[in-house]
């Protein structure tokens, strides 16, 4: 009798712990769930040939702590970015160039941030949480920039986020702001900033501007890594 009562007492807790991540394989269904539950979507984009994608599947996504701590905090969506039309659409829309990539999307499908490459299970929860609501998450950086628009560091960090999203115009503007705020390279941002500005200009088809920026980099900071 005592064993039966104990079993009945712990049964609800056993049922409340997911045994695995509840993956959606249909984008519309995933976002329907996200809107109903007001949870962000984690869209895992992978390819069949991707070794690190398989490693994420066999380790990180099967880790009991990941499942327990994160399983019900997000809506999980997995799509093959090469063979699934919905996966290919997300790949094009968000400029994903490597796998695995985990897009963190709000319930309306807007990108919050992203996690690229293999992340082991012991690092995954902390890194994911930092991207969702940490000070260096995209929303966190937007807030920090609003509070301190003259921070070279914040401008550089948000520029890097834009660059990762292939938003080259916005990236170049904030890299330029970082360079202007650190003209003597005291924070070690101006030389990197000029290099990345040249890259954004090249991606925007502004080849002459890119060459001029590289010349400026070599002139102002001849000892930097990019000038050698």
Report residues per predicted region.
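Non-catalytic, surface beta->alpha helical segment in thiol-disulfide oxidoreductase systems
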Residues: 61, 96-136
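Short active-site neighborhood of thiol/selenol oxidoreductases, capturing the structured segment around
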Residues: 37-50
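Short solvent-exposed coil/turn linkers within tandem alpha-helical repeat scaffolds
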Residues: 64, 114-118, 148-150, 165, ...
């Amino acid at each position: 009798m005592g064993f039966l009562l104990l079993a009945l007492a712990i049964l609800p807790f056993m049922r409340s712990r997911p045994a695995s991540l509840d993956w959606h394989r249909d984008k519309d269904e995933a976002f329907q769930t996200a809107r109903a539950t007001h949870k962000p979507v984690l869209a895992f984009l992978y390819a069949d040939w991707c070794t690190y994608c398989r490693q994420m599947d066999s380790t990180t996504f099967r880790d009991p702590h990941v499942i327990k701590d994160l399983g019900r905090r997000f809506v999980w969506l997995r799509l093959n970015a090469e063979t699934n039309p919905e996966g290919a659409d997300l790949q094009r829309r968000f400029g994903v160039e490597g796998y695995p990539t985990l897009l963190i999307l709000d319930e309306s499908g807007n990108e919050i941030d992203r996690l690229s490459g293999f992340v082991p299970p012991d690092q995954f929860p902390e890194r994911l949480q930092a991207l969702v609501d940490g000070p260096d998450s995209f929303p966190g950086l937007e807030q920090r920039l609003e509070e301190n628009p003259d921070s070279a560091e914040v401008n550089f960090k948000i520029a890097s986020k834009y660059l990762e999203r292939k938003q080259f115009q916005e990236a170049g503007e904030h890299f330029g702001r970082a360079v202007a705020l650190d003209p003597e390279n005291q924070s070690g941002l101006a030389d990197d900033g000029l290099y990345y500005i040249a890259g954004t200009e090249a991606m925007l088809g502004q080849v002459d501007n890119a060459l001029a920026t590289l010349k400026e980099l070599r002139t102002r900071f001849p000892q930097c890594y990019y000038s050698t």
